[in-house]
Amino acid sequence: FPDQDDFGRVFYLNARMSALGIPQMAAIMGNCVAGGAYLPVMCDTLVMTEGSGLYLAGPALVKAAIGQTVSSEDLGGAVMHAEVSGTVDYLEPDDAHALERLRRLAAGYAPRPVAGWARDRRESVEPAQKAEDLEGLLPVDGGSQPYETHEIIARLVDGSAFDEYKARYGRTLVCGTARLGGFPVGIVANQKRVVKNRGRLEVGGVIYAEAADKAARFVLNCNQAGIPIVFLHDVNGFMVGVDSEQDGIIRRGAKLVNAVSNSVVPRLSVILGGSYGAGHYAMSGKAYAPRFLFALPSARYAVMGGQQAARTILDIQAAQLARSGAEPDEDTLAELFERIRAGYERALDIRYGAARLWVDEVVMPLELRLRLIRALDACALDSEPPPLKVGVFQV
């Protein structure tokens, strides 16, 4: 339904935030018409500058709809709303005075109590490892290159101190606790280099059964301790094949999805490289409502990678052509594959997702630590989380 994430939903959230006690102030410094007129009026406080307009329909539409001729000021001007309708709380002469009024109003709010986990905030310490190294360590090609994830974490957390959980088990996911801007946090990150587990090599960026088990337990531990979780994505998905199925990848993957879905502590997600398919979901992707979802400029974000998607779509289209009697030759298939791949690659670009609000912000690597700390600052103002309930777990 086209309104699902548009104005109707915005109005709904306006009202819900008010019910939660979140202060909302608005300043009208221009024209607010139709749906845009409801937003400021649903706020706690409304400031309006002289010469601005606020109406459900402008003068031209009013004349067309009911034949009434009226000036903009008489219909919905600032003075009219201040003196006649009583809609405006504060009338100001210009933008500068309106902004100053907002500052004074904001200063009058009592400080909000912080969430329990935020009361344990300590003095922030810069990472011991140089943050400037991040640009050289992080992927520049959407996550296909291997790298040591611990080196990334060391350049984000306070003092580069990271207390790893089950470090020698399920090693394609790195879990542990640290401090970020003084706040206690849990971290779940995809390991991008090849690791050895029980004598066998495991591909970086892939979630194996044991890693899913470990991460599910760690997410529950963070909820038990009441601390936020930061997810660092660079994931191709869950491992497939005979060995993986016999290891219970579906059951154990479902356990991780369950734990993340029902987690009640704040979750922040960052797409460092690629984030694809069910791996994206398990790492607290957009559908799992993280408080913030950031991405680096080189990030890639889709159901699957470009090559795999193009091959799948090509197979479907080739089968359709064959059924219609038009058996394609190799050159035709190659041309079709390249056209599909190029189109899919454009959609993989993080700017494509950002333009559709699939991520909250595209962040430069050197700004990532600060963005995460600011996000935690915002999360700290939230109320205490409800009790954790996870339903039935596959064991």
Regions found by a protein language model. Give the residues of each.
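Ligand-binding clefts of soluble mixed alpha/beta catalytic domains
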Residues: 1-395
